[in-house]
């Protein structure tokens, strides 16, 4: 008889490579979901979504009645295994991607063996002890501190300098992206929650992960998020900037699903970027430019950089390869009264931003599949 738990393990390993503790992972999943529920999970397509009526048809052909289907599917939603949300044509289902599936296990408040397993899994990823998907396309991209996006200066009549807004697009502005989404919820930061569980709490705020639309609907149904209005969401963004956290958003245009606020001490996106490995997150469309002004207090602006891209010894040195264009140093320098000693300018080349979340994840899945095959041929684990 087919072992669906082994199939689930292979599904995880497809995305993140060999798990550090497969035996405990399997034990935890056996405590979390039943084989009957996993049958429903594997009826969903590998990527993309499926309409409820089509999924019901598949279940019926497999001998699962309507009442039993909804019971099993509801449990999978509660456990973060699948997503269920409304579309104009009715309810729609999709597998939670590996990140989503892992996040929900950690966000569950009960202290269970599976929660501890997934917290250790996340901690191992943050520490670089396990590999990540061999994709080239970043899952997320940085959004700069909004007040630092003034655009370039250009000359107009009467010899006056004004800011040119043409370089700044709505996809660069966090508050504009948040206000464009009809449904917003806030959840605990997955990374910091995991670190807290394993005894590595960094002290940064926990309730900072913004989710939208389908993802927000799924988390709200599972009781793992809190619905908020646009004003509170924007306030959370501003509070996170004051904390020195970096905004990361889905690397896609159109509707967004998540906006993370990451710290360099606990969050995987910054950890991977600092180690210069993998492609979990990409930089913003901007990079730092230094005016050349000799200001001793610039040393205070250097300290806030989450990437160690700045150094000061009488003059400022910028490592543009490490600068992710978050704008935290620019914001700090302006607070200290140094004007435009540092400012953000458009980056010459930045990672491609995909047209939609669906297109983004299809591309990442293709790249991961090819990368895993290549790694296997080369004998890599």
Please report, for each region that a protein language model flagged, where it lies by residue.
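Long, low-complexity, charged/polar intrinsically disordered regions in eukaryotic proteins
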Residues: 1-27, 251
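Ferredoxin-like iron-sulfur electron-transfer modules
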Residues: 31, 61-64, 93-95, 246-256, ...
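Short acidic, hydrophobic short linear motifs in intrinsically disordered regions
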Residues: 47-61
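Short amphipathic alpha-helical interaction segments
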Residues: 62-78
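A short, conserved structural fragment
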Residues: 74-88, 310-311, 339-342
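Short, amphipathic alpha-helical interaction segments positioned at domain boundaries
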Residues: 90-130, 367
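Catalytic cores of enzyme domains
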Residues: 129-287
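Flanking helices and flexible, charged tails adjoining ferredoxin-like Fe-S electron-transfer domains
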Residues: 320-381
């Amino acid at each position: 008889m087919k072992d669906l738990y082994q199939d689930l393990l292979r599904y995880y390993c497809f995305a993140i490579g060999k798990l550090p503790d497969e035996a405990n992972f399997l034990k935890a999943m056996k405590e979390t979901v039943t084989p009957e529920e996993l049958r429903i999970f594997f009826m969903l397509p590998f990527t993309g979504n499926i309409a409820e009526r089509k999924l019901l048809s598949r279940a019926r052909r497999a001998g699962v009645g309507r009442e039993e289907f909804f019971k099993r599917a509801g449990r999978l939603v509660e456990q973060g295994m699948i997503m269920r949300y409304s579309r104009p044509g009715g309810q729609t289902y999709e597998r939670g991607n590996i990140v989503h599936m892992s996040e929900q296990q950690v966000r569950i408040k009960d202290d269970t063996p599976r929660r501890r397993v997934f917290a250790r899994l996340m901690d191992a990823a943050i520490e670089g002890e396990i590999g990540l998907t061999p994709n080239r396309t970043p899952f997320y991209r940085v959004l700069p501190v909004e007040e630092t996006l003034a655009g370039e200066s250009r000359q107009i009549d009467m010899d006056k300098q004004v800011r040119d807004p043409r370089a700044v697009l709505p996809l660069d502005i966090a508050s504009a992206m948040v206000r464009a989404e009809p449904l917003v919820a806030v959840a605990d930061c997955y990374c910091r929650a995991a670190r807290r569980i394993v005894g590595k709490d960094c002290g940064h705020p926990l309730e900072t992960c913004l989710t939208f639309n389908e993802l927000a609907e799924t988390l709200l149904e599972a009781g793992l998020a809190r619905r908020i209005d646009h004003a509170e969401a924007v306030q959370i963004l501003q509070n996170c900037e004051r904390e020195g956290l970096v905004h990361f958003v889905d690397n896609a245009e159109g509707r967004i699903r998540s906006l993370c606020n990451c710290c360099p001490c606990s969050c995987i996106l910054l950890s991977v970027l600092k180690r210069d490995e993998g492609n979990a997150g990409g930089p913003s469309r901007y990079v730092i430019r230094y005016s050349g002004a000799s200001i001793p207090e610039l040393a205070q602006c250097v300290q806030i950089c989450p990437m160690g891209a700045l150094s000061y010894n009488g003059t400022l040195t910028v490592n543009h390869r490490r600068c992710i264009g978050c704008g935290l140093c620019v914001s700090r320098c302006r607070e200290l009264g140094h004007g435009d000693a540092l400012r953000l300018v458009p980056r010459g080349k930045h990672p491609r931003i995909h047209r939609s979340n669906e297109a983004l994840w299809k591309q990442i899945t293709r790249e991961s599949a090819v990368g895993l095959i290549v790694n296997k041929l080369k004998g890599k684990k």
